[in-house]
């Protein structure tokens, strides 16, 4: 018969199990218990005793477990960061100067990275079968095009009465400067409902957008700038901005409710 004794060590607890003459240790989070010693009987009825576990020994066990976990996570992050589909491009991470991408052209003339083409087509077809008509509003952009969009947004803000500094700061909440836009990777598509092609807050109320947000991970996409994560992504919530990361990563990120920055620990 096994009996367990829990020994508190700050925020960690060592569980000691006696099986016959053997002693086993387990670790779990705990608070408030003090070290104890005890005695018990094994299956033969023979009296036995547990030597008191010292705080140093228990701490070493906890530290070993923590180091093992940290090492394993470091390896996972290293592999994730090597994955080209998980390339992080944001306000703090520029697109590599030597970045190149093979493009595929959609029927409407937009271009996307070849690697995402099939899954994108499958997602749009599935949306159509579900009764929703989805339009690609934007996809791959050259650096020149990205800069044009930023300047247009700044001019619009100036027209609306903002100072130059205010206009630039406001524009950067929604439009990235060239070299720092995910659209330059070819992995991004802005998708809108055919009956509402506005890139604003009304988009998330459309049936098409609701379907996309619920199902995009099945096809390797994530909602890149989710609501409530603005301080992490650096951008305002965009219900139409979908980023391809591959099916496995999309599934994990959706289940864990994390952004690409969090997934890569960047």
Cite the ranges covered by each PLM segment.
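Extracytoplasmic cell-surface/polysaccharide-interacting catalytic and binding patches
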Residues: 2-266
């Amino acid at each position: 018969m096994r009996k367990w004794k829990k020994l508190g060590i700050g925020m960690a607890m060592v569980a000691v199990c006696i099986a016959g003459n053997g002693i086993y240790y387990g670790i779990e989070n705990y608070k408030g218990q003090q070290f104890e010693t005890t005695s018990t009987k094994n299956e033969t009825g023979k009296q036995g005793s547990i030597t008191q576990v010292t705080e140093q020994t228990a701490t070493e066990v906890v530290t070993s477990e923590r180091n093992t976990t940290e090492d394993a996570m470091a390896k996972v992050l290293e592999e994730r960061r090597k994955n080209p589909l998980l390339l992080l491009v944001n306000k703090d991470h520029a697109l590599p100067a030597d970045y190149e991408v093979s493009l595929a052209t959609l029927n409407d003339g937009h271009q996307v990275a070849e690697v995402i083409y099939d899954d994108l087509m499958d997602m749009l077809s599935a949306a159509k079968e579900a009764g929703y008509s989805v339009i690609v509003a934007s996809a791959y952009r050259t650096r020149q095009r990205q800069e044009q969009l930023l300047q247009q947004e700044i001019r619009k803000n100036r027209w609306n009465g903002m100072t130059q500094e205010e206009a630039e700061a406001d524009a950067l909440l929604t439009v990235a400067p060239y070299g720092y836009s995910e659209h330059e990777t070819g992995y991004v598509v802005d998708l809108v409902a055919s009956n509402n092609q506005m890139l604003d807050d009304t988009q998330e109320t459309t049936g098409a957008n609701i379907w996309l947000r619920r199902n995009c991970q099945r096809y390797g996409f994530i909602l890149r700038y989710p609501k409530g994560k603005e301080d992490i992504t650096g951008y305002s919530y965009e219900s139409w901005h979908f980023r391809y990361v591959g099916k496995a990563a999309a599934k994990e990120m959706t289940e864990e409710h994390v952004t690409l920055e969090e997934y890569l620990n960047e």
